[in-house]
């Protein structure tokens, strides 16, 4: 269990996360299949294992892992538009009258309801790790919307979840721009070979570089004309690599072979043991990595009143 993306949320108050109580709460909203006329469903699933006996909360040391699954019917907009146009044309031709917006919207709803039972179904899972001692919730997602779906559903079942996206004192873009300009990142961080540069003007240009020497004259020229770094590939120690963006989203996390080999040794022969070992090692690594990342970005910002 290695996260591929990371959105970090700060608990703004102490929350007494009790594994047994959390298990009971999550069980009140289990994931389920869409009914024939439902567009989507959302609920909690076991992060590891299958079947009714698989726990909805996986506990390892001081960490908890939960997972939510979304099931949605995929109805392409083009299919609905074509069917609606055909129906509107038919009515206007047969009844010799214009179909206006209110009726058009009603027809569209009827078409969607007729097509839903035949629509393809897509399932997606989102994992979140809770670290109560650190006051953090880490979501394996690059989309804030996807993370908020999980957090709002968690809030719904436990009653209260005082949490906010973690922010830092210095703009990540400003820090990353400085690292590329000076060709030196903070201690234990190393600039790799990929970045995105944007003009600060609203309609300004975007330059995306991959497998390129970011210390070269071409990159420095872009920076000298006012572009700033909005995404940057980095490595931390010899343990992981990732892409950081200007919204503090960590993407394309890759844990180096050394960590994966250690987890494989720790986990034994069973699949569940392997998953547990990798999750534990990942969380312990995050326990070192995240404080260093936030410090490198100017330190965590604590809003007034919190």
Curated annotation (Swiss-Prot):
Subcellular location: Cytoplasm, Nucleoid
Keywords: Cytoplasm, DNA recombination
GO molecular function terms attached to this record: double-stranded DNA binding
Pfam families assigned: RdgC
Entry keyword annotation includes Transport: no
One BP term from GO: regulation of DNA recombination
Family: Belongs to the RdgC family.
Role played: May be involved in recombination.
HAMAP family reported for this sequence: RdgC
Name of this protein: Recombination-associated protein RdgC
Organism of derivation: Pseudomonas syringae pv. syringae (strain B728a)
């Amino acid at each position: 269990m290695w996260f591929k993306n990371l959105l970090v949320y700060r608990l703004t108050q102490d929350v007494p996360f009790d594994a047994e109580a959390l298990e009971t709460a999550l069980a009140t909203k289990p994931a389920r299949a869409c009914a024939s006329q439902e567009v989507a469903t959302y609920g909690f699933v076991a992060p590891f294992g299958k079947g009714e006996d698989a726990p909805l909360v996986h506990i390892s040391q001081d960490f908890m892992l939960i997972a939510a699954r979304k099931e949605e019917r995929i109805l392409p907009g083009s299919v609905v538009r074509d069917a609606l146009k055909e129906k509107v044309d038919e009515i206007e031709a047969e009844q010799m009258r214009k179909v206006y917006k209110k009726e058009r919207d009603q027809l569209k709803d009827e078409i969607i309801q007729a097509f839903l039972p035949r629509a393809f179904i897509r399932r997606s899972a989102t994992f979140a790790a809770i670290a109560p001692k650190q006051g953090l919730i880490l979501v394996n997602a690059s989309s804030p919307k996807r993370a908020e779906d999980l957090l709002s559903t968690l809030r719904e079942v436990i009653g209260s979840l005082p949490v906010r996206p973690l922010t830092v004192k210095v703009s990540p873009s400003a820090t990353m721009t400085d690292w590329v300009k000076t060709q030196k990142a903070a201690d234990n961080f190393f600039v790799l070979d990929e970045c995105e540069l944007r003009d600060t003007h609203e309609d300004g240009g975007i330059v995306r570089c991959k497998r390129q020497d970011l210390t070269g004259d071409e990159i420095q020229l872009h920076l000298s004309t006012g572009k700033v770094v909005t995404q940057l590939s980095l490595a931390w120690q010899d343990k992981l690599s990732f892409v950081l963006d200007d919204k503090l989203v960590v993407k394309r996390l890759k844990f180096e072979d050394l960590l994966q080999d250690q987890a494989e040794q720790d986990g034994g022969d069973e699949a569940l043991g392997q998953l547990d070992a990798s999750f534990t090692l990942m969380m312990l690594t995050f326990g070192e990595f995240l404080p260093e990342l936030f410090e490198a970005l100017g330190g965590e910002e604590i809003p007034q009143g919190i």
